[in-house]
Amino acid sequence: MGSEAAAAARAVVVAVNGERYEAVGVDPSTTLLEFLRTRTPVRGPKLGCGEGGCGACVVVVSKYDAVADEVTEFSASSCLTLLGSLHHCAVTTSEGIGNSRDGFHAVQRRLSGFHASQCGFCTPGMCMSIYSALAKADKASGRPAPPTGFSKITAAEAEKAVSGNLCRCTGYRPIVDACKSFAADVDLEDLGLNAFWKKGVDDEHADINKLPAYSGGAAVCTFPEFLKSEIRSSMGQANGDTSAVVVTGDGWFHPKSVEEFHRLFDSNLFDERSVKIVASNTGSGVYKDQDLHDKYINISQIPELSAINRSSKGVEIGAVVSISQAIDILSDGGAVFRKIADHLSKVASPFVRNTATIGGNIIMAQRLSFSSDIATVLLAAGSTVTIQVAAKRMCITLEEFLKQPPCDSRTLLVSISIPDWGSDDGITFQTFRAAPRPLGNAVSYVNSAFLARSSVDGSSGSHLIEDVCLAFGPFGAKHAIRAREVEKFLKGKLVSAPVILEAVRLLKGVVSPAEGTTHPEYRVSLAVSYLFKFLSSLTNGLDEPENANVPNGSFTNGTANGIVDSSPEKHSNVDSSYLPIKSRQEMVFSDEYRPIGKPIEKTGAELQASGEAVYVDDISAPKDCLYGAFIYSTHPHAHIKGVNFRSSLASQKVITVITLKDIPTNGKNIGSCSPMLGDEALFVDPVSEFAGQNIGVVIAETQKYAYMAAKQSVIEYSTENLQPPILTVEDAVQHNSYFQVPPFLAPTPIGEFNQAMSEADHKIIDGEVKLESQYYFYMETQTALAIPDEDNCITLYVSAQLPEITQNTVARCLGIPYHNVRIITRRVGGGFGGKAMKAIHVATACAVAAFKLRRPVRMYLDRKTDMIMAGGRHPMKVKYSVGFKSDGKITGLHVDLRINCGISPDCSPALPVAIVGALKKYNWGALSFDIKLCKTNVSSKSAMRAPGDAQGSFIAEAIVEHIASTLSVDTNAIRRKNLHDFESLKVFYGNSAGDPSTYSLVTIFDKLASSPEYQQRAAVVEHFNAGSRWKKRGISCVPITYDVRLRPSPGKVSIMNDGSIAVEVGGVEIGQGLWTKVKQMTAFALGQLCDDGGEGLLDKVRVIQADTLSMIQGGFTGGSTTSETSCEAVRKSCAALVERLKPIKEKAGTLPWKSLIAQASMASVKLTEHAYWTPDPTFTSYLNYGAAISEVEVDVLTGETTILRSDLVYDCGQSLNPAVDLGQVEGAFVQGIGFFTNEEYTTNSDGLVINDGTWTYKIPTVDTIPKQFNVELINSARDHKRVLSSKASGEPPLLLASSVHCAMREAIRAARKEFAGAGGSSLTFQMDVPATMPIVKELCGLDVVERDLESFAAKA
């Protein structure tokens, strides 16, 4: 080993965007992302999750094969890829394919032009996923050359290119359009609103020549020549080297054979506890490293492990072959191989599959009980594995391997062999998986794979099973298993209903989830469903086919009512989950206030796509910067007796721990404060009050060291003399634990409820519904950088929606004047309310550490900590009593509402008025309520997009649907009957109702729900359900009313001597397009001084970052009205400037802008103006209206829901920027889909969040949005009291997503009706939020298969 030790100082050499970098003295555990962001100027790749689950960090990695003289390139997660494994590789980031200096790439320009970037944090990763998919398609052989300007990629491939990338802002539709614009098989006219041609205008036709030019990947060199030369040179040197091990960097070893691996591992160089064996390291996304490792053995360069051997017997795949490579290999094989490849393509995401290895997946399943799809599928296919332990090599079945005790690090998986089942017509091979996402990164609840050899019985047409293999995956067992008892039973049987029924009964005894498994009954039901589907396919008549003549009213062409006409296509057997995404946008453009009203691109979108846009964590670390990570309590109510650290490499990196004692003497222990709602503690003092509460901040030299050290903390708790924690609303009620609602925030009841109930023909007493929480999942986690300054001053760069309150809190905590604290926020990588009060804690903790240590301190929360501490949306329990007439007219409603607010008030006292405000969209006759804010020992809940309104609107729909079900009438009839007329609207909403001409809800609702198109679609749904047993559809139309408040707002406009313009506003750019609208307003307001009406000024305007020492009384960014109020403040500033400049303009006549400003400057005209706009006291709020129709398809066997189509009509007033408002509508709607359907926020018995990462918390992805997504923005009427007659768009459209939940209820009702004859359940049922797959399946019936089979068997 002498030569290896001597070589240990060799540098890892990589090329980054064509530049050479040597990594010397780098921690061997350094990831590529960490290296890029700390050792290079690159900032495009972002840390979004650290799990390979979000795509924010995606880069393209290129490798050079000097022997073949070939470069291969693929996308990869830089957060998982270790730098030490990339010696002599090239890395290309978003900056490398295009930037502001060298010119933007077509991908970047199209993402910008299709309005596909909002907060922009995810955009560089999106960009590289798309770029990689284009490069792969264009290099593929056998594909025809595409027309000029297009790629070889297909529209279907383009959609899947970003299937693993998360975006919380856009709703994905514009991203999909940008992707598909490269595909030659797409109709450009079908693409959505963009900046390249004006849709809906006769002389503006879609044309490839109008799109930014694309000429393949030739313009970007991903592998520089100098690196090729180095590789060739190193090969020559290696030929004379007797060592079989290559050593790079500090602690990286690359054995070249299996034998050398064992010799190396058994040497005295390694301590098994600190060495890590890696091939791709993607497993660390699932099983996080709990400590640092100082040595790594990279087995990916062992040729035998990457070999692929084909023969007549099958294919042998080396253990380090990537999943993507395996898919490519198997796709060229027989039917069984192709089916395996198809299933593997649904595992992980493209950028993970490109590096994750087949062997690594199997090893995790065997050693760590990983929920592997691959193990299940290969098990059913009869695969064997070759393993080597020391000098002993053996070939055993995969089943035997999985059953063995967990293998140790010395056991090397060499290869996996899959037999070739040939073209035997008697072989049937099927695979199944149920996961929250069809294509995205989601572990399945259950997966299964079945292989049978059978022959057809001539008399019955059913199959005689000769042999069968039934494999089932992660249902709560340690690993995939074969259902041997069931297999034994089935062999020799002719498949029939009685046989399947008995097989199902046997299976339920085999599939037994371990204790503690989530949704155990659902998982068993899934296993039964999959066996049923498989065996039914081998019968004649039992597996009832979908009616091939049932029309599909969801995917249509043409327009009707401003949406889409319903020329029905024929329903096919294509899985609706994989239908292509279609869309249409309708809106009215106005030139009245140009450039206000133009759908211009979002300011900075191209910079966001290239990765040049600077977020807080992109700011270069100051000299001597330290890094912090929270140590938090895992107990909800306990004395903190002490904090220690385990003896580990990570704990050795701790510099200090900042705690309560480090707050200055004159300071206070506050982590957030509100003059009206109270304070929340920054540190535990001395009793933890909830799981997730901050105990202290670990300080270390790097962010990774801080993260890892925090994991090594050991907290000593004591619950002596403490009461049990209050965790639920039921606990709070029992202990009378409540916060008070200030009188000025309390909603007002309407009418006399008791009298209203006495007038009712029917009554529902104590109806109930529950709504759970939702996590923000902004792509950029909480982050701050604190830099101490002279004279006890401090500057903080914070990702915050409340810079002013952050300043106040930091100052109070440190005991210094407010003017000593400067908060700067340029842009926020997603907020949704989560960067409001919750961001203050991080900033304040950072400030305390920096103030104490007199050094800069930076904190960037890891995703798990962020999710645990964030709080999220308020969960609540609702009970209601409602009276109504026989015709459906409601007479009175009383609601008992218990809201889980957490440990502090935060924004909770403002929730009741919001809930009631959204609830009042219907005329309830009389409305009363009893709302309690429950104080509990959980992290305080905070504002999340449409806080309270989202729940209130849904509660109204749940009640209306209950009434409709009770009366057995169409729900829309109840909705329409109880919509307000203007008189009742005024009673319920007062001044917010505005003028009669602005009340557009009835018109909108009738446009959708009363249209012939809707009636036809409803009939199609009913017809479909009559012909489909195992898939049911539902359609629903939901109206919304949303009350928004106008707030005072400052604005400042400064004209420079060259005519360029700097604008400051109190609001923060969080992706909502604030800067864009402000630019347009500035140009409009100053436009009367210009001959072109101000359009030429757009490029001269720059909106600068929020700075609390420059712009005081900035208020907060939230409530959906920040953009319009900021615009009005700017307009007011501009008006003053215009008055000063007008005399010069009038005197000179025609005068270019630059000359006008030059003359004004010479004349000493003041060229800056600060204004503070306040709303008219008689008009401080207004109502927003909209409605949505959603149509869904529910798989009765699995609970999976596909949103076939959503049609949204939203009254946006006279839009300040239709492109921005459209993006807000679509993004809010999709975020709402997550809340109502799929985002499962789960805690343990101590209230600690356990769905704490991308592996367990599933926000919507490109494959879960509506397959047809139509949006119409309407302008109901002028209203001079609003800002240029505009309306808010950020939050109200989220409420429309309840239409999906309501449509799901209709589909479930159809399923329950279908099986009513077999002991089905009531057609009136409670359906809580979110309606996840397990909930949907349970409501459809966990035992529908058994009941159906019993029915068939009885007829046999």
UniProtKB/Swiss-Prot annotation:
One of the record's GO molecular function terms: oxidoreductase activity
E.C. number: 1.2.3.1
Catalytic activity: an aldehyde + O2 + H2O = a carboxylate + H2O2 + H(+)
SUPFAM superfamilies reported for this sequence: 2Fe-2S ferredoxin-like, CO dehydrogenase flavoprotein C-terminal domain-like, CO dehydrogenase ISP C-domain like, CO dehydrogenase molybdoprotein N-domain-like, FAD-binding/transporter-associated domain-like, Molybdenum cofactor-binding domain
Top EC class, one word: oxidoreductase
Cofactor: [2Fe-2S] cluster; FAD; Mo-molybdopterin
Assembly behavior: Aldehyde oxidases (AO) are homodimers and heterodimers of AO subunits.
Residue ranges of the region described as Disordered: 552-576
Name under which the protein is recorded: Probable aldehyde oxidase 3
